[in-house]
Amino acid sequence: MVTLFCAVVGVAGSTFPVDINENKSVGHLKKAIKEEKMYQFPADELQLFLAKAGGNAWLSSLTEDVKKLKKGEKTALVKSLTQEEKELQGEDPISECLEGMDPPKVKQIHVLVALPPGTSSAPISDGTDLWLSRFQHSEVAKLTLLPTRGDLNEFIGQPLPVKIGLPQSVFQAWSSPLILGQLLRDKLFELNDISPCEFLKDSVFSAAFLYPQVDGDATESAFHYFWDSIIRVVLGFVFRRAYVNRDSSRKSSSGLKRPDFLFALDHICVFRGEEKEPRTSITVPREELSKKLVWSYGGVPYVFGYAASGFELELFAIYQDVTGNVKTHLIGGFNLQHAPERFRLVLALLNLCLLFPAIVQNCPASAGTEFMDIHRANGVKVRLSPIFVDKIFHTQEEYRRVKQIYDSLKAYGVPCADAVVTVDSDQLRLTLKPRGIEMKPCSLSELFVALGNVLEALVVLHRNGWMHRDIRWSNVIKHIDRVEWFLIDFADAAQSPQKYPSGDHLTHDEHASDIFMEGGSHTTAVDLWAVGYLVKTSKIEREWTAEPERALFLDRLMNPDPSARPTADEALQLLSRFEREAAEQESQGKGVRKKHRRA
């Protein structure tokens, strides 16, 4: 068995080895070369020549002839070696061809391969899919392997782990300093005339990328297509199933909410952008990157974003500092008016793509709800943003009814409840605040807080003759930044009493039975039953009922007879007493345990 290094004449690319038994024929060698290079024509159409340097020596890889050969150029020596009379014949044995030559070694060229006429410069296949597969296999696998914030500037400028193959004509044309330059070219691309990434080239480096039709006096809207032609195209090309949205708060009346550009993997916004027209200072979108973000990414070191003002663009790592504040760390600046800077941004974005999966995999579930659209069965669309919640109604009637309810809540000063901050009658949209997280209490002390918050709201609500009617944990939401809860979704709220069938659409297993009694009516007492239901469906019902008086209180709350249930005022007073007693018992227990340890 012998290893022969082969080079294709007239085609840019690296040499390749072929292992073959010396007892085989040149025809077998042609077949092996065809299989290695996946050529789509018969093997016998290949022409093979020995790469002799003179005497019994082989062409050295260090010579100028071989260097030019790899670039697709034919030197006088290569032309002389590939004359027709020197072609190896298919029936010739390999051993006879090698007779009199030095034993083949590495750093040599042994066989020159000439392709059939008409195929010398034609690609055999598009290399885009193979490039993408290899590139994605280069992703950073673990969170601990992510570069530090301080190293990100160097990281985004490093050569790609898998270079993008370009045909010789494009490779040479883009080498101009006005387009790319050799240093940046060699970080992004490599010569490949056999299977260049034609689809990638045409998709990412399109005419819109190379020759942008926008100038420095254009509006922000005019720049959207330009920014997208780089950022959206690159990210979307690498991650085909990602969610990409832009300008999603423009139609909203609630001010700061969603970013101007949003890129999410598995529902997690790992990359975002804030954009302004050219005449705006870039400090404005830079500050919006941190102001619009409420950190929900747990312990990951950072996510990413950009600030753009016309052609000026800055890349940032966005992180949470030790005090809990969201900060930005500049990792790169670009003047996209110039072609080399646009290519440099592509390099930075592709390198950042290598980090996205590890970040997404280590985010908590809450990060996936930062931006989410929920479609209710009643036709209401709920749009979640970091700080706000939009509710878009299906009918004018429903929009007005819910708006009137929230207007009443505001007039009464109902505490511990969400509130409408802006309205859009044209879009049938109510924007509510705050935005919290759906999380049940994890301890008895937290349950006291949550129930107390609900009862504080009910005291004021009931005092003004209203009832919520749909209290359950999905409508009791925890604040993002503190251990307190608030009541949401007053769409089913009504004045007390209500006659059957009002409220009949509610679920029987989650609501008091008096709502569903034919011919009957229900009052604010249904909300007290619901407070008991919160205890029953909490994570710590057993701990609650371990105290007999608390267990009796739970029975009273959920008594089938509405008149036997306590009022919200009474329930809040009892809850406060239970909370004090539990705190005293906990304090006494700690004292006893401390004495035992001393003993």
Curated annotation (Swiss-Prot):
Record key words, sorted: Glycoprotein, Host nucleus, Kinase, Phosphoprotein, Secreted, Serine/threonine-protein kinase, Signal, Transferase, Virulence
Gene3D superfamilies with a match to the protein in the record: Transferase(Phosphotransferase) domain 1
Signal sequence, renumbered to the chain: 1-17
Motif (HVLVXXP motif): 110-116
Superkingdom assignment: Eukaryota
Keyword Transmembrane helix: no
Phenotypic consequence of S474A: Impairs host cell death induction
Catalytic activity: L-seryl-[protein] + ATP = O-phospho-L-seryl-[protein] + ADP + H(+); L-threonyl-[protein] + ATP = O-phospho-L-threonyl-[protein] + ADP + H(+)
EC annotation from Swiss-Prot or TrEMBL: 2.7.11.1
Active site: D470 (proton acceptor)
Region listing for DWL domain, in residue ranges: 53-109
Region (LQLFLAK domain): 18-52
Complexes and interactors: Dimerizes in host plants.
Entry remark concerning the domains of this protein: The CRN proteins have modular architectures that include a signal peptide, a conserved N-terminus, and highly diverse C-terminal domains. The conserved CRN N-terminus harbors a distinct LXLFLAK motif, which is followed by the conserved DWL domain. A highly conserved HVLVXXP motif marks the end of the CRN N-terminal domains and forms a junction where diverse C-terminal effector domains are fused. The conserved CRN N-terminus mediates the translocation into the plant host cells.
Record's protein name: Crinkler effector protein 8
Protein's organism: Phytophthora infestans (Potato late blight agent)
